[in-house]
C-alpha cells in the first residue's frame, strides 16, 4: 500500500519560530533545512536540551516518507537455476586453494566444526555447501542446487534458507539431533578488494540452545556430562554425572556406583545432549535415543576441571561447595562448563549464567526406575508417548512455563523427607481452604513470563527488547504477590520466603527497564524505535534532527507539486532506491527538466532531484547514528539486567514453585481429593481411592473407588479376578497415590494414611526387547530380578502377572517363590495381581498375606464387571467369556469351552 504524504506526519506545518505545535527554534543551532549530518554529540545533546522530547513522542528512526509497495527483501540467489548435477559431495575431496575465496573460507570454518552443520551468510540467505547442503536438503526437504566453484571444479552442492527464517530451520535441525554453527556477516561494507568479514557468531547444540523457539516451554532442556571408572577387582563400576539446563541455569552433580544406576538416571533425565570422552559410540549404560557428543578427555581431567570451575564461578577454592567429595562429578561438571564456553561465543561482559552446582545425595528423592515411570505413565502414555492421558496431564494446572517445568521435576523426583513434603502439603491445604486467595494468585501468575529463561538470555547477551520488557513486567508483579502472601503461607517451604519480601534491587531494575524501553518494541533491534524519548540527550538530539528532515521532505513534496503542477505527485521511499518522486504515466509530460528519471514501472515513473539525493544521504546517516545509539543504550541495559540474572532466577523459582502448589490446590479443590496423613511407618491405608487419570478420562460412567490396606501386619495382597476387570488400574492407582503424596499433593481418596516409601517398583504388562535379543519372558524375569535385588521393607511393589510366559507349572512355581520372598525375607509392601489362583493358599500359611478379588456379576452368558475389590480369592478368571466380549469368533469360543471342560474332567 502506497502512503501519500497528505494526512501523514509529513503534512505538519513548516517549523518557524514560536509557531503553534512546534518546538521553539534556537538561534545558535543549525537551520534544520540546512542540517549538517555531521553534528557532534555535544551539538546534538545541546539540541535535545533546547528542544526536549516527551516520552512516547513520535521518533524519526524509521523512514517516514511514503513506502513503496514493492519494497520487499530480495530473496533471490545466484547459481540456483542450473540443472547440472553438482559433482563434489564432500569438502575434503577438494584442495582449498582450488576454491573461490568464499568457498575457501567456508571450508576453513567447516574444518574447525566438522561435526556441525555450517550455515554461511551470503546476502539474504544462510547457505550450506558440500555434505552439509545434502544434509540440509534431505532433513528439511529443501531444494538441492549447486554453486559454481570455478572452471577447474565446476559446481558443488548448495542449499540454503532465508536469513529471516533461520531460527525456525535451526530449530528443526536441533530437534533432529544436529548441532549448527552460524557464520554471519560482521560488516555491511567490505574493505576495498576484500570479502565481507564473516565469522562464527553462534554454535547451537541440542543441549545449549537459549532461543525460545528451540526449547519446549514446560520441560527442562538438560545437557549432561558423565565420567566413568570401570569396575576392577577391588572396586565396583563408579560414575560421576553433571547436568545443567543452560536455559534456566539449574546445575546439579551426583556420584554413584553401578552401571544400572547410571542407565536409570539417564533414562529419567532424558538429556538432549550427553557429553563424554570415551571411544565407544554406544556404551551399555547409555539408553537408546540419548544423543552422545564425544569430547576430548582433557576438559574432564581433574586439574583442567578444577581450573574451569574456579574461573567460571570466580572462586578461590572448591571446598566451600563440596565438589572435592565427589571427584568424578567434579570432572564431569568441568567438562560440561568447558563445552558450554566453547559453544557460546558471547559479547564482551556477557556470560551464560549458571548456578553453583548442587550435589544430589542418595536418599533425597523417591527412586523410580525406567520401567516404573513407563508403567505409571508419569509424563507420557505408555502406548503412544503422549502427554494426554499421563499423570502430568491430569494434575498440571500451572499457568506459567516455569511452573510447568517445576511440577514435572517434582513428579519425576518425589521427596523422601517427611518435613519437606509436609511443607508443600501445608501450602496446598491452605490454598484449598482459601479459595479467594488461590484465585487472586492465579490471576497474578497467569500473565507471568518465563523469567528463568529470559534472565538467562539477558545474561548471555542474547535477549531482545521484548525479552527485557517481559522481565520487567514479571518483576513488577512480585510486590503484588507479596501483598497477597503476607502472613498467609509463612510455614511453607523456605524457598517461598523469596516472595514475601522482594529485593528492592529487582523493583529498581524493573523501573529502569520500563522507563527505558517502550511497552511494545519491535522484534528486531536493527529497526530502532524501541527506546523512549527523554532517556538519552544524544538520541533525542538525533531524533530532533530526523524530525527536521521529515519536515523538509514534506516541504519538498509541496514545492515540487506546486512547481510541476502535478497534484498527484508523491514523495516516497524504497529500501533499495531511496527517496524518489512518483508520477503517473499520464503526467510525465509535465515533469520539469531538472528531474532525473530513476525507474520506470508499468503505471508510473520515478524521479529524483540532486537536492533530494543529497538530503537522502544526510537522512540515512542520521538514521544510522540514531539506530546505533539505541543499540548502545540497549546493550548497556541488557548488561544491567544480566548482572541481576541470579537474583531474578531466585525469585522466578519461587514463583514457579508457588504456581505448582497453587495448581495442585486447584486440582485438589475441584477433584474431590483429600490431604493424606504422612507417617514414618510402613502403613498404606486408602479409603475410596481412585485413579487420578482414568477418572478424568471417563465421561459417561463414574469411576468405582476401592480401599487399600497394606503395612499394618499385611505385607502382601494376592489380587485375583477376571481378565479386563481392572486389576492393572487398581495397581497403578496405588502407585500414583503414593507418588502424589510424596510430591506434596492431596490425593484422590476419601481418606489416606501413607508411610514414606523409598522406592516404587511396578511390573505391569509385558513386552519383548528384540533389539537386545530378549523374549517377553526374559524381560519379565529381568524386571523381577531387579525388584528382588533392590526392594526393601519400605518399598512399594506392584506386580501384575509373573511367570505367565513359560509352562504353567514353571510359571506358578516362580510366582510362588517370588511371593514368598517378598512377604518373608523382604517384607516389602506388595500387591500381586495374578491368575494363578493357587497362590491364594499363601494366606493360609503366612499371617502377613491376604487375598482380595475384583468382583464380577455373572447372569447367564453375560458378565458384568463391577470393578470392586473385596476380600477373598477368585476361583475363576473368565478368560473365555472375556474372549467372547473381545469379539473372538463364536466357533472358536465354543471350542475353547469344550477344551476347558475336558481339561477340568
UniProtKB/Swiss-Prot annotation:
Record's keyword terms, sorted: ATP-binding, DNA damage, DNA repair, DNA-binding, Nucleotide-binding
Residues the record lists as binding ATP: 721-728
Similarity comment: Belongs to the DNA mismatch repair MutS family.
Domain of life assignment: Bacteria
Residues passing through the membrane, by range: none
Gene3D superfamilies found in the cross-reference section: 1.10.1420.10, DNA repair protein MutS, domain I, MutS, connector domain, P-loop containing nucleotide triphosphate hydrolases
Keyword ATP-binding: yes
Pfam family, one: MutS_I
SUPFAM superfamilies, A to Z: DNA repair protein MutS, domain I, DNA repair protein MutS, domain II, DNA repair protein MutS, domain III, P-loop containing nucleoside triphosphate hydrolases
Xref: InterPro entries: DNA_mismatch_repair_MutS (IPR005748), DNA_mismatch_repair_MutS-lik_N (IPR007695), DNA_mismatch_repair_MutS/MSH (IPR017261), DNA_mismatch_repair_MutS_C (IPR000432), DNA_mismatch_repair_MutS_clamp (IPR007861), DNA_mismatch_repair_MutS_core (IPR007696), DNA_mismatch_repair_MutS_N (IPR016151), DNA_mismatch_repair_MutS_sf (IPR036187)
One cellular-component annotation, GO: cytosol
Biased composition (Basic and acidic residues): 38-50
Name recorded for this polypeptide: DNA mismatch repair protein MutS
GO MF annotation: an example: ATP-dependent DNA damage sensor activity
Biological processes annotated in GO: mismatch repair
Role: This protein is involved in the repair of mismatches in DNA. It is possible that it carries out the mismatch recognition step. This protein has a weak ATPase activity.
Disordered: annotated span: 1-95
